[in-house]
């Protein structure tokens, strides 16, 4: 089968030179951020996009014989902090606001909380590589498609609305992975409107399935921060399931008005951190499930005949 896609670096004009790997295949994006694999194995595939100093893009696709599968993703810049394992330390990301610098993520590591993967003690320098998604414009860099295992029915999935998510990796100076020996406290300002004491789901990303999995809850404190404890590091997400959705409909056409087929569209929320995916039908129509009455950016990647199309517009979800 064929896999075609588009990727780029958030807040950067770089589109070319990003390494993309579905399985054992590998290529780099062209100057427009496009990539293509004409002999991808049929079946489920994990498409990774990597670039030094950025998060890893992760999408999960199905590849079919003699058909084209499309996908899209973005990568987000990471920051690296250090502290001595014996002493512990605090990682605190911040950004400039109209009121000065504000903390966007805090992770508190107690002394001796970081160990080797086999559980043995580690006393050296810990390198913490982190990235924080706290705005809808950054959601393209989130792994997967914002689907989670339904807590009511583990065989089903449910879309999520996020209020902030982050990823963290712990390594030695040589790049050896490190682990936590105890839970650590994290907090970050929750996106949206919340009340002190609100309990919100805490989800972690399962790279094997491409789904978010609920691992407990966190609480909104008096300053509007989401506060929780985590026992390991991967992507962590503060979410609530979207139980009611609305079909955002449209028609994908080329420059001459001819319907585009063989692709998909992705809706990314403008006024909320969520969205969805939808396939483009043979007549060019599509339907993407989104939060009712929400504003969304619609991004398209498709192949029609020998032409690869990309496009972007906006749309509003209907009533529930």
Where are the model-predicted features located?
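Proteolytic cleavage junctions
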Residues: 1-3, 31, 52, 59, ...
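Short, mixed charged/polar active-site loops
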Residues: 26, 56, 102-106, 273-275, ...
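Predominantly extracellular/luminal cell-surface or secreted proteins
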Residues: 8, 23, 131, 203-205, ...
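Short flexible loop/turn segments that cap and initiate beta-strands
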Residues: 13-23, 119-126, 181-183, 198-199, ...
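A short, solvent-exposed loop/turn motif at the edges and junctions
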Residues: 22, 42-66, 74-76, 291-319
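Predominantly extracellular/luminal regions of secreted and cell-surface proteins
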Residues: 104-152
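Residue-level detection of beta-strand scaffold positions
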Residues: 19-23, 33-35, 45, 214, ...
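Periplasm-facing N-terminal accessory domains of Gram-negative outer-membrane beta-barrel systems
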Residues: 3-40, 46-50, 60, 70-71
């Amino acid at each position: 089968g064929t896999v075609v896609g588009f990727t780029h670096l958030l807040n950067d004009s770089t589109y070319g030179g990003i390494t993309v790997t579905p399985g054992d295949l590998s290529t780099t994006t062209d100057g427009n951020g496009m990539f293509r694999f004409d002999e991808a194995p049929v079946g489920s595939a994990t498409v990774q996009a990597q670039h030094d100093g950025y998060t890893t893009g992760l999408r999960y696709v199905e590849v079919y014989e003699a058909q084209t599968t499309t996908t899209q993703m973005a990568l987000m810049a990471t920051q690296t902090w250090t502290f001595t394992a014996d002493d512990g330390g605090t990682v605190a990301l911040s950004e400039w606001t109209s009121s000065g610098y504000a903390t966007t993520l805090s992770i508190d590591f107690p002394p001796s909380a970081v160990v080797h993967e086999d559980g043995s003690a580690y006393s050296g320098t810990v390198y913490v590589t982190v990235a924080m998604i706290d705005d809808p414009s950054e959601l393209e860099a989130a792994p997967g498609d914002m689907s989670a295992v339904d807590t009511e029915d583990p065989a089903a999935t449910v879309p999520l609305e996020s209020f902030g998510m982050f990823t963290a990796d712990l390594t030695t100076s040589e790049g050896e992975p490190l682990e936590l020996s105890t839970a650590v406290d994290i907090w970050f300002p929750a996106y949206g409107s919340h009340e002190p004491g609100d309990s919100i789901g805490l989800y972690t990303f399962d790279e094997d399935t491409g789904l978010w999995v609920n691992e407990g809850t966190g609480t909104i404190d008096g300053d509007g921060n989401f506060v929780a404890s985590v026992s390991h590091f991967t992507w962590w997400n503060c979410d609530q399931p979207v139980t009611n959705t609305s079909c955002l409909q449209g028609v994908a056409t080329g420059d001459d008005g001819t319907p585009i087929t063989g692709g998909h569209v992705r809706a990314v929320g403008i006024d909320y951190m969520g969205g969805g995916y939808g396939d483009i039908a043979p007549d060019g129509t599509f339907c993407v499930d989104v939060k009712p009455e929400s504003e969304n950016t619609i991004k398209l990647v498709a192949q029609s005949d020998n032409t690869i199309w990309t496009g972007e517009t906006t749309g509003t979800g209907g009533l529930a």
